[in-house]
Amino acid sequence: FRTRQARPEPAISIKAEAFADDCSLIMPYDEGSIRAATEVLNRFSKISGLTINQGKTQVLKIGGAADMPDLAPDLGLKWVKELTILGINLMADPALTINNFEEKLGEVNSIFNKWQYRNLTVYGRIKIVKTLALSKLTHVVQIIPQLDEKRIKTLQKAVNDFIWKKGYQKKTVVDFETAQLPPWAGGLGIPNIGKFWDALQGNWIHRFFRAPDSCPWKRLAMRDLKTALHMPDLELSDLTSITPRKIGTHAGNISNPFWRKIWNNLQGYTESY
């Protein structure tokens, strides 16, 4: 799909994100692009017999266009301040995506309440935490740029309270630090929420190296890394010759909080292997 065809500069090619009967398009704040996209879909409907429901088609303005006026009102599109894609609420202000965590935290606490008074061993409760509770958060971790320390402690407390029955456990076998160690190290394998969150976000390192160089988000991440390292000619292959410590040291210069934290944790990721 190509946008900005109504402008004099070269058009921009964008791939559509489609799943079943849902389709997401990302395009610039430009009336010509919106009309061009609508025209493509209308032409497709004449061939396939599938018609877009424009009354249910939502448009979210992001970035600098968040407060700009709506475009092409005659198309009947629904302009919104928030929309939901695959269970995640997206807003024009990235900071508001933290609301997704609050919603999932409520679901986690609901699971704990359902199992709280079951006659489970400590090992059984740990299994509930890992299989039913934390699995609610794995997708959210990929969306929320950064979780603050207060919320991490809140979730950790909820996990600990559930496992140890909110202090009603007659005997605590080991302290919390030891309990978080893996069983082979003498612990119980109780999840450390901070490390759990960092580990899931660390998966983006793998995605970064595997994604095509033409991928927009990779180009942006690479641009910020070049600036932080003061290496304007840096290539992807050059990263293997730069120590994780050096990258982590310069990560503080990256403006994007998501990538700043990931690159800052790079040495920890490598040491874990």
What is each stretch, according to the model?
Residues 14-46, 63-65, 92-96:
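Catalytic palm subdomain of template-directed nucleic-acid polymerases
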Residues 1-18:
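Active-site nucleotide-donor binding segment shared across nucleotidyl transfer reactions
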